[in-house]
From Swiss-Prot:
The lineage of its organism: Bacteria, Pseudomonadati, Chlamydiota, Chlamydiia, Chlamydiales. It is an enzyme of class 2 (transferase). Its EC number is 2.1.2.9. CDD domains: FMT_core_Met-tRNA-FMT_N, Met_tRNA_FMT_C. (6S)-5,6,7,8-tetrahydrofolate binds at residues 112-115. Keywords: Protein biosynthesis, Transferase. Belongs to the Fmt family. This is Methionyl-tRNA formyltransferase. It comes from Chlamydia caviae (strain ATCC VR-813 / DSM 19441 / 03DC25 / GPIC).
């Protein structure tokens, strides 16, 4: 077990997966900080974060400040006399007064290859950009947004059909290992830090729901990258109309590139293959919709959707932006 006393900051499942790995390897986590409970989706009841649930199950002291700058919270942190703070997808900015508390500083696990994709959505943005390699970067935090010196990097390939959710799982599964290595280097005095090359920096801001609206007037490869990048959240969607009725929202849960590249049609046109596949024409090529969710209904495969729309070849059309 490492002798370092660690306080862990994190909130979503990504952070819970990493924390569980640290605990499995006997990292001395003496306290956990997570965001306050918030209602999720249709539930009006506050729901604890995955990190909170894990911390409580392990009987680890837990803090949930409304603001990380709260003076009482800062005094509580100081009372732990921690050696290191580890921050993984906490979800709030930590000011310098907090970063100065631990003996050896604060280290952040960033789910991207810094200095590229600084910000809240490195996983989604890199897939939307069509990159083939991502990874985790550990930085010693400073007051900037993901601008700290690099202490470690690990790499994860991005498969051609990988969604943001799948990449997040791969990165979180690897995150504990690189953090344990970092903590060991801090403990034995071999840690080194490399300044980021800011000339190579890019920003990855949080995605809006509107960015899930599929733009069919791009080549199919770019459309597919967009769909994968916003899956599962904020989610890919389009609008469709049927028999001159008002347009409705259609959520795209699973899709693929159409295997037949010789597909022609205006962007947004519906094409039904001989195998009863639901294809949507793009500027070049087409997207095959595998699993969808029409507005007001549950998720279904494309064949079920087509069976409910007679004369679909003539009267079903997807709106294009």
């Amino acid at each position: 077990m490492l002798n370092l006393k660690v306080i862990y900051f994190g909130t979503p499942q990504f952070a819970a997966t990493v924390l569980e790995d640290l605990l499995h390897h006997d990292v001395n986590v003496i306290g956990v900080v997570t965001r306050v409970d918030k209602p999720q989706k249709r539930s009006s009841q506050p729901i604890p974060s995955p990190v909170k649930t894990l911390a409580l199950s392990k009987n680890i002291p837990l803090l949930q400040p409304e603001k990380a700058s709260d003076p009482q919270f800062i005094e509580q942190l100081k009372a732990f006399e921690a050696d290191v703070f580890i921050v993984v997808a906490y979800g709030a900015i930590l000011r310098q007064v907090v970063l100065n508390i631990p003996k050896y500083g604060c280290y952040n696990l960033h789910a991207g290859l810094l200095p590229a994709y600084r910000g809240a959505a490195p996983i989604q943005r890199c897939i939307m950009d069509g990159v083939t390699q991502s990874g985790n970067t550990v930085i010693r935090m400073d007051a900037g947004m993901d601008t700290g010196d690099i202490a470690g990097v690990s790499y994860v390939p991005v498969g051609p059909d990988m969604t943001a959710g799948e990449l997040a799982e791969a990165l979180s599964a690897q995150g504990g290992e690189i953090l344990i290595k970092t903590l060991q280097q801090i403990s034995d005095g071999t840690i080194s830090h490399t300044p980021q090359d800011s000339s190579k920096a890019s920003i990855a801001p949080k995605l809006s729901k509107e960015e899930g609206f599929v733009l069919w007037n791009h080549p199919a490869e770019k459309v597919y990258a967009q769909i994968r990048g916003v899956t599962p959240a904020p989610g890919a969607w389009t609008l469709y109309s049927y028999q001159d009725k008002p347009a409705k929202r259609l959520v795209i849960r699973k899709a693929s590139l159409a295997s037949n590249k010789g597909i022609y049609g205006n962007p947004g046109d519906v094409i039904v293959s001989d195998q009863q596949e639901l294809l949507i024409a793009c500027a070049e090529g087409a997207i095959c919709l595998k699993e969808i969710q029409p507005e007001g209904k549950g998720a279904m495969d494309s064949k079920t959707f087509l069976n409910g729309h007679s004369n679909h070849k003539l009267k079903l059309s997807f709106q294009n932006n």
